Amino acid sequence: MASGGVVKKEIGGNHDVVRFGVNDSVKGDLAPPHPLQASVHKEAKFWADKKRFGAEAIYGSAFNIRKDLDAQILSKFQRPPGALPSSMLGYEALTGSLDDFGFEDYLNYAAASEDGWVLGRGALELLLGGTAYTQATSAPQISLSMQQVQRRELQLVAVSAMLIDCKYEEIWAPEVNDFIFISDSAYTREQILAMEKGILNKLQWNLTIPTPYVFIMMLSASADNKSDKENAEALKFKRLSQSRQQLIDWSVKIKVSKEHGGFMRFIQVSCLGASASSSRMLRAKAAGEESVLKEFPEPLRLLISHRQSMGTCILNFHSRIQPVYVVDVAAAIVNSLKDDGTSMGKSYGLGGPEIYTVHDLAELMYETICEWPRYIDVPLPIARAIASPES
């Protein structure tokens, strides 16, 4: 997979460990052919080009997927008398109480509904793809994960979150009146601005969060997607398959993506050592692997090295980590898309050339940002007691 001293070691079954050297050069067209700015510019040009792929086509495609999501998710529980799938422009059609639906099922439905509405309206407004992506991933988190939101206010949260993200991403952000228009005057200016303030206060103004959007577009370009329409479809299905495991069921999302995208292979990026008995993060990875296997019996699994010492946690400065360069991981993904299918059904462990302790990485981080270390050594039981509410 890489030249210049790559070491492969069999660790049992179909698992291979691929260790990348520091100065390894990667074979083939692994680096994205387009620089970052060119990729973003390409996406911006696509959204502004109505002739190549009109906003109406995007809206119609999103609406069809949204209807299927309604059927998939609502079929999991009994629909109360008179309850109808919500339309793309509102949630008032969804009737019945939360007790009838079940709170977890309601979260599933609400998250998918909000994503569907955002997808269509964001495309209609011809915003930058990054804006629509950020808004589609942040609005459900704000409305469903961080606080309780009434059913009739879900669309208001989506509109206000879109306003925030436009101010953050766009050079010229739309006015509040534009959002009143796209919501069919369902909310007033005062309601939208009040919800905007509420969201910002809830987030404590922490808006700078990393998203996979740029990496998705770079990988899409490096996978020889010639059409901007293909890039948009890939971005759309990626949004539908976000790893909000507690909000939307994995198997439902993968099934929808598989049926609409016609995928022939599935590549899953997970962690080494993921199991039901691991830490919470690794347990989530293990649950994701189990859900993937339900729809794709033989996926290609790329397992990134997480920690070498099992049973330890991030609080333990002696925990060992073998980080791998993200470009090497991206190269492995791109190469797996270009092979003849022989890699399907196998698992590859990806690890870097060096092994560090958590203490080493902390020292490196503070040295890089030119700040004095802000940690103290405490006994591990005390550290666990302090961190237990957040774990």
Swiss-Prot record:
Keyword Cell cycle: yes
Similarity section: Belongs to the cyclin family. Cyclin AB subfamily.
The keyword Membrane belongs to this UniProt entry's keyword annotation: no
A GO BP annotation: cell division
GO CC aspect terms: cyclin-dependent protein kinase holoenzyme complex; cytoplasm; nucleus
Molecular function GO labels: cyclin-dependent protein serine/threonine kinase regulator activity
The protein, known as: Cyclin-B1-2
PANTHER family: NADH DEHYDROGENASE [UBIQUINONE] 1 ALPHA SUBCOMPLEX SUBUNIT 9, MITOCHONDRIAL, NADH-UBIQUINONE OXIDOREDUCTASE 39 KDA SUBUNIT-RELATED
Keywords from the named record: Cell cycle, Cell division, Cyclin
Organism per entry: Oryza sativa subsp. japonica
Coiled-coil regions listed: none
Superkingdom to which the source organism belongs: Eukaryota
InterPro entries tied to this protein: ComplexI_NDUFA9_subunit, Cyclin-like_sf, Cyclin_N, NAD(P)-bd_dom_sf
